């Protein structure tokens, strides 16, 4: 199963898993991640601009085995734990 994480600069925002059959599941990370993105974007003067959107980049993770929801749970736990969100 392919796993990708959407980042705004260095802050993860969304997890997407794609099964071998092409089925996709996505999960937004907790609100605290979006709040941090918004805070930094305001500090950098990027709110409401194309430059804000240009900061979003997909990162490919190592393929994972397991059920899609289990993979989403595992990746979310890995991303949330270091930030204590």
Predicted regions and their residues:
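Short, charged/polar N-terminal "headpieces" of proteins
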Residues: 1-24
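Acidic, aromatic-enriched beta-alpha/helix-loop junctions
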Residues: 20-57
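Acidic, low-complexity intrinsically disordered segments
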Residues: 46-85
């Amino acid at each position: 199963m392919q796993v990708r994480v959407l980042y705004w600069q260095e802050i993860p925002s969304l997890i997407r898993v794609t099964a071998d059959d092409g089925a996709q599941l996505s999960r937004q990370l907790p609100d605290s991640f979006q709040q941090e993105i918004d805070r930094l974007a305001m500090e950098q003067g990027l709110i409401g601009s194309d430059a804000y959107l240009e900061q979003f980049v997909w990162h490919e993770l190592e393929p994972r085995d397991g059920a899609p929801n289990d993979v989403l749970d595992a990746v979310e736990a890995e991303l949330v734990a270091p930030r204590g969100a």
